[in-house]
From Swiss-Prot:
It comes from Methanosarcina mazei (strain ATCC BAA-159 / DSM 3647 / Goe1 / Go1 / JCM 11833 / OCM 88). Residues 180-383 are annotated as: Metallo-beta-lactamase N-terminus. This is Transcription termination factor FttA. Pfam families: Beta-Casp, KH_2, KH_TffA, Lactamase_B, RMMBL. Binds 2 Zn(2+) ions, which are required for nuclease activity. One of its GO terms (molecular function) is identical protein binding. Disulfide bonds: none annotated. Residues 579-637 are annotated as: Metallo-beta-lactamase C-terminus. Zn(2+) 1 binds at residues 242, 244, 329, 352.
């Protein structure tokens, strides 16, 4: 059936289900949702169940757009909104978009603008006609969030056309009578880095992640040139499980070589993805490395990105529904559940996950409506890869920092900008506040402060305890005075040239570049100082070499020659802060999964870890398993 006939049929069905006196003028697909156009937005606002009931009846996401002729002026609208919304919400800005009929309201306390069960939003629509969308005013100023919001506002018309094209492709008619499901491993199997998979059916091709192996020049990119993937315009959608570069660093490259479809991720992942992609190409340029794409491709990716919240069931292809669930790995990290066909098959891609409550996040979700196949990470899949309890890890970190400070030294902590940094920040803030370690400045360098600002913008993605602390007690640990952002080369040099006892968190986490290397060069030869590892160190990185006990580290000198740097500083590995599940948690995650899966495939770990985990799941849980290898295709159904 042609798409115009599909829309006409939907319009007739909607009109039959609307209450008496409520009318629509048109319907159109915008991305995964169906948009209803009406001259009577106030009637829809009167009854909050109209849209909900239609969505349930049609089994699709529905949004409403008002006719521009029935909208109040922006000036009158602002006056009315400020009468309806409590002043305690602290509204900081408005943006009116006549094309969509939406008013974007930025407020410090979005919940007060929304009201109980959306009552205040409906009241706003009843009085002004506009559809209010609420975003949080970042409690810490974020250039990334500010620029993304401005960019999206400035490109609304183009984005609307993109969404229209995407929507029509999603809702096209299924033509194949065959029924099969396959997964192709394109990267990240029996290795850590360049994660990428293709989920295929007779109707659809979905790319899950497209990462870069930052620790390797030879095996940096996934196998995107294979016939299953290329040309890229045959892919229906790209899914990004989380914002680390080894899962999303090459998504803009897809657009450079012909991809024009949607990118699905959570809202925090979108913000962090932009931050890390721009930093990635900036660092590559400064280090004289090949730049895989320009900043314009990052912008194009952003235009095509469709953010989805957890638990939001969404059509992404004619025969596939996607639902994101909390993965507990980093901010916005998602376990991706794919419902294929009409109950034909269900696949769960875990991405990276943590099956334990941490300072930042709740444990990874492992309860689903249905699941037959699980594709699980195996970073710590080795039989002896057990991590200490988080409380023990925190005590270890406190002891290391305390001892270093008391002997007049500096604790340098290489950390990813996203995830471990914020976990460590919360522990350090509490430790200083309670007097468990001396009160010293904690310097944050290399995007860590900007990433922290994005965390503060999305508190609803943090765990319950942290949300209560922020919302109910008004205590935001990220705003502590002990944290000192390092926002320039001059500020960094001041710390290096005038060394005083302190803690330095700096990127990159594996010491393969970034400002941490400047601190390392400056402080490595002083035995009073300590290098503290709190995250995974991949093979081939300087971090892994130091962990192996190297006492002389080859470094590039000022004239480009190689110089050997003597390692006199203490080296401490504080296990337990990892955002990955350890061996015990990996096994428990599968063991406690509901319903019980039929098969489990392992990936994202070295060969021994992937094989060992797969073998143990098979032997102990009696579930079919396989350690996937790059470039192999497995039929699931």
């Amino acid at each position: 059936m042609p798409i115009e006939d599909v829309l006409l049929d939907l319009k007739h069905k909607i009109e039959k289900n609307l209450p008496a006196g409520v009318t629509i003028t048109d319907v159109e697909f915008e991305g995964p949702q169906l948009v209803l156009y009406t001259e009577e937005p106030r009637k829809f606002a009167d009854d909050g169940n109209i849209i909900r009931n239609l969505a349930k009846e049609l089994r699709t996401r529905i949004a409403m757009r008002p006719d521009p002729r029935v909208l109040a002026t922006p000036e009158d609208s602002i006056s009315i909104i400020e009468e309806v919304v409590p002043k305690e919400s602290v509204i900081s800005s408005y943006y009116f978009d006549p094309d969509s009929g939406e008013v974007i309201i930025e407020a410090e306390k979005p919940g007060l603008v929304i009201g109980k069960h959306g009552a205040t939003l409906r009241e706003i629509t009843k009085q002004i006609g506009w559809i209010p969308k609420v975003v949080r005013t970042p409690p810490i100023k974020s250039r990334t969030v500010k620029n993304i919001r401005e960019f999206m506002r400035n490109n609304l018309k183009e984005r609307k056309e993109i969404l229209k094209t995407v929507g029509r492709k999603i809702h096209r008619e299924c033509t194949s009578k065959d029924q099969w499901v396959r997964v192709t491993a394109l990267g990240g199997c029996k290795e850590v880095g360049r994660s990428c998979f293709l989920l295929s059916t007779p109707e659809s091709r979905i790319l899950i992640d497209c990462g870069v192996n930052v620790g390797s020049d030879e095996n940096m990119t996934p196998y995107l040139y294979v016939p299953e993937v290329f040309p890229l315009n045959q892919i229906d959608a790209v899914i990004v499980t989380h914002a680390h570069l080894d899962h999303q660093g090459l998504v803009p490259l897809l657009f450079k070589y012909g991809y024009e479809g949607p990118v699905y991720c959570t809202p925090p992942t979108r913000d962090l993805m932009v931050l890390l992609q721009l930093d990635y190409i900036d660092v590559a340029a400064k280090e004289g490395k090949k730049i895989p794409y320009e900043s314009g491709m990052v912008a194009k990716t952003l235009k095509h990105t469709i953010p989805l919240d957890y638990e939001e069931v969404t059509d992404i292809a004619p025969d596939i529904k996607l639902t994101f669930h909390n993965a507990g790995h980093i901010l916005g990290s998602a376990i991706s559940h794919f419902h294929i066909g009409d109950g034909l098959h269900n696949v769960v891609f875990t991405g990276d996950y943590k099956y334990e409550k941490t300072r930042l996040f709740d444990p990874a979700v492992n309860k689903f409506p249905r699941v037959e196949t699980v594709i699980s990470e195996a970073t710590y899949g080795n039989a002896n890869a057990f991590q200490p309890a988080l409380k023990d890890a925190e005590k270890h970190l406190q002891m290391v920092v305390k001892n270093t400070i008391e002997r007049g030294g500096i604790a340098v902590i290489p950390a990813f900008a996203v995830g471990r940094s914020q976990e460590v920040m919360i522990v350090l803030e509490e430790s200083i506040r309670k007097g468990l370690i001396p009160e010293v400045p904690v310097y944050l360098d290399g995007m860590i402060w900007e990433a922290t600002a994005i965390h503060a913008t999305h508190p609803e993605y943090l765990n319950n305890d942290l949300r209560k602390l922020i919302f109910q007690k008004g205590q935001n640990p990220f705003l502590s005075e002990c944290f000192k952002p390092v926002d320039s080369h001059e500020a960094r040099q001041k710390i290096i040239q005038n060394p005083q006892p302190c803690v330095i968190l700096a990127t990159s986490g594996m010491m393969n570049g970034g400002p941490v290397m400047e601190y390392f060069k400056a402080f490595a030869e002083d035995p009073r100082n300590t290098l503290v590892f709190v995250g995974y160190q991949a093979d081939g990185t300087i971090g892994r070499r130091i962990q192996k006990g190297w006492k002389e580290i080859p470094m590039t000198g000022k004239n480009g020659s190689t110089e050997m740097l003597k390692m006199n500083m203490e080296v401490q590995v504080v296990d337990g802060f990892s955002g990955h599940s350890d061996r015990r948690q990996l096994m428990e995650y599968v063991k406690r999964m509901q319903p019980r899966p039929e098969r489990v495939f392992t990936e994202h770990g070295d060969e021994k870890a992937c094989v060992d985990l797969a073998s143990s799941v098979y032997k102990k849980l009696k579930i079919e398993t396989r350690a996937l290898t790059n470039l192999e295709t497995v039929r699931l159904l």
